């Protein structure tokens, strides 16, 4: 996997960076969210030292968050480098319990600000994250995509553990007010996220009848 050479600051407290994984034949995206406790890296791929220093600035790294069992990527590198905890659902790492592991579950808040939303039926240990500040942000793993050839779409059925369960779980997102969505695969949606989600779920509901 190649190292990202730059990042994009999409909001004052949000940044993303990306690279192409030849093995998976997919664009991989990572997010950084600055909260009261410091900066959280979500599904981190490796980023070069100079942009990393710019990204962090003088703020502490508060932890690494992994949204499912397929997204460890370069998490171990940053856990060791910054001596910070790993936040993940137990099902995402059934055969490993790294030092500093903190188990997350539905409704738990990471750093008092990031709410965990379980997305059952997608990948192993799949979660979405919700940050209420600045009109609301979702950060999602594999359950929602915004990349070619799918566009803004649900994870295809062939990759799901239980697609019906995933669809039901994703509808929990409609309980929240959110302006934007950041993805592990695809460019962010930076406005009108709630409307886009309602439209997506309406289309998905129609397609199942």
Where are these regions (language model features)?
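Short, glycine/charged-enriched secondary-structure capping and boundary segments
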Residues: 55-57, 78-81, 101-102, 152-155, ...
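Metallo-beta-lactamase
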Residues: 2, 6-8, 12-15, 21-23, 77-80, 84-125, 132-134, 161, ...
């Amino acid at each position: 996997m190649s190292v990202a050479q730059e990042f994009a600051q999409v909001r004052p407290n949000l940044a993303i960076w990306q690279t192409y994984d030849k093995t998976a034949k997919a664009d991989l995206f990572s997010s950084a969210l600055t909260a009261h406790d410091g900066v959280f890296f979500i599904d981190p791929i490796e980023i070069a030292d100079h942009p990393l220093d710019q990204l962090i600035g003088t703020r502490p790294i508060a932890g690494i968050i992994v949204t499912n069992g397929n997204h460890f990527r370069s998490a171990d590198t940053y856990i060791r480098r910054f001596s910070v905890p790993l936040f993940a659902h137990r099902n995402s790492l059934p055969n490993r319990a790294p030092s500093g592991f903190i188990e997350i579950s539905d409704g738990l808040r990471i750093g008092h600000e990031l709410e965990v939303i379980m997305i059952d039926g997608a990948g192993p240990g799949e979660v979405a994250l919700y940050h209420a500040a600045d009109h609301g942000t979702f950060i999602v793993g594999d359950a929602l995509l915004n990349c070619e050839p799918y566009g803004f779409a649900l994870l295809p059925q062939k990759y799901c553990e239980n697609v019906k369960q995933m669809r039901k779980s994703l509808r929990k997102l409609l309980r929240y007010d959110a302006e934007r969505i950041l993805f592990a695969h695809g460019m962010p949606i930076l406005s009108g996220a709630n409307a886009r989600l309602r439209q997506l779920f309406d289309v998905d509901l129609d397609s199942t009848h």
